[in-house]
Structures are given as C-alpha cells and as structure tokens.
Amino acid sequence: MFEKLHVVCPNCQITNRIASEHLTSEPNCGSCHQPLFNASSFNLDEASFDKHVSRNEIPVLVDFWAPWCGPCHQMAPAFEHAASQLEPDFRLAKVDTQAVHSLAERFNIRSIPTLALFQGGREVARQTGAMSAPDIVRWVQAQALARNLG
C-alpha cells in the first residue's frame, strides 16, 4: 500500500492528499483542478509560505531574493531549471524579501540569494550565494540524503 502525502496547491493553497505513486503522474488539485506540479517555482507571501512549509509533506526549497539583487537575477533561470529536475520530490518556491520583509527577518536572512530547505515545518539546511542549476540540484539531493528527507 502506498503512502498518502499532503501536497499544497501552488494556485489555490488548498492541501491535497496524493498517493505517493501518483506524484509523477501529473496530479491536479482537487479544489481548483490546476496541476499540483508544473516544473517551475512559484512566489510566496507570508500566509502562503506558512501553509507550504508547514503542510507540505515533501521538502520545500525556498529562494529568498530581492528585485535589486544582481546575483538573484542571475540565479533565477537556474532555480527554474532546478525546479524542472527536482519536482515532484521537492517543491520550489521564491520569497521576495523586499516585498515580504517579515519573512526575511523571521528567518534571519542577511545575504541574498539564500536557499533554505524546509521539511516538516522547520528549516533543515541553508546555502547562501548564487548557484548554477546543477549545483542547486546536487546541493538539494545531498541535503536530502544526509537528512533522510522525502
């Protein structure tokens, strides 16, 4: 019997229960009927951040960035490419620290870009500085292996 996982919809923020064997079969949200995974990241505000980090039973990788940050803009395409490789085993999201400065303060973000990996509502790993897509994928997979995530 397969495990049922809670996966928060990036469109309507409703928590869905998905059998683990169906994660790779392009599941749709039971509420809004949009795809739960679309091989790209999505933006979070404070309320959606808390839902995704606390309710998703798959690890959530968050890119803390700012619009004025050159390295953040350089890393953005790499983060999107990493999303296409890491979903559905990981959920990738972005937080604009200028628009949602309360989250930057809450997580003591002092340098951007900063990647933070969350599992079970808590931060389990952090990496600061721009990275290429292969480096992001390797880092996430190494963190998952070291911490037995996912």
Language-model segments: residues:
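A short beta-strand-turn-helix
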Residues: S41-V60
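Non-catalytic, surface beta->alpha helical segment in thiol-disulfide oxidoreductase systems
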Residues: S111, A116-L149
